């Protein structure tokens, strides 16, 4: 987080982060580091499906994002203000706002993305490469096939539905979907129910 904070403030040329959230009440304040994002605790659901279904599953995750927010909303208050039903969404989107994307995309590093994926999830990694400046300029040593630098760069782009690359125990790359829209808690039962709902809807849609 120290490195992330340094780079965000560098990309902002030292200007403070400005937060403006309007809801039932309004909140306006400035902050001089990225740690406001720590107030946006979420339930991050990771789903891995066979590769032949990964693109369809990703698009389905986008489709059910609004119902998931409606189902899981659990963060109406911030600093004593009654804002959105899920106030962590605007909070997180503004907590790492560097305004460095091309005009074509028009999205920040925390966003809903640019729409459905037409061919495969490679489209999203090409967007990462072509339209998002490197935030953590750290060249990781080792075998390029370990995809360390790709994973590091992807980890600094926080789509609400994000493709993730990792290596399995045999060193083979694998893809999974990280669904980030759900709020944390408030109870273990809620977390389990929300996770099962998301996974069940996706798997059900894949069988249609």
For each of these PLM feature ranges, what is it?
Residues 1-208:
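Phosphate/nucleotide-binding catalytic core
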């Amino acid at each position: 987080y120290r490195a992330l904070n340094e780079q965000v403030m560098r990309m902002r040329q030292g200007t403070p982060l400005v937060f403006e959230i309007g809801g039932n009440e309004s909140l306006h304040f400035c902050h001089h580091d990225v740690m406001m994002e720590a107030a946006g605790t979420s339930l991050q659901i990771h789903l891995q499906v066979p590769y032949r279904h990964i693109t369809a599953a990703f698009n389905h995750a986008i489709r059910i994002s609004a119902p998931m927010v409606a189902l899981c909303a659990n963060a109406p208050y911030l600093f004593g203000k009654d804002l959105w039903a899920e106030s962590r969404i605007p909070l997180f989107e503004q907590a790492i706002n560097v305004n460095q994307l091309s005009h074509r995309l028009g999205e920040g590093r925390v966003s809903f993305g640019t729409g459905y994926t037409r061919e495969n999830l490679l489209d999203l990694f090409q967007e990462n490469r072509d339209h998002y400046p490197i935030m953590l300029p750290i060249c990781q040593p080792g075998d390029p096939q370990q995809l360390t630098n790709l994973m590091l760069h992807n980890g600094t782009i926080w789509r609400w539905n994000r493709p993730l690359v990792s290596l399995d125990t045999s060193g083979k790359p694998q893809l999974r979907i990280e669904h980030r829209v759900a709020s944390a808690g408030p109870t273990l039962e809620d977390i389990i129910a929300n996770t099962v709902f998301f996974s069940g809807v996706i798997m059900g849609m894949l069988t249609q």
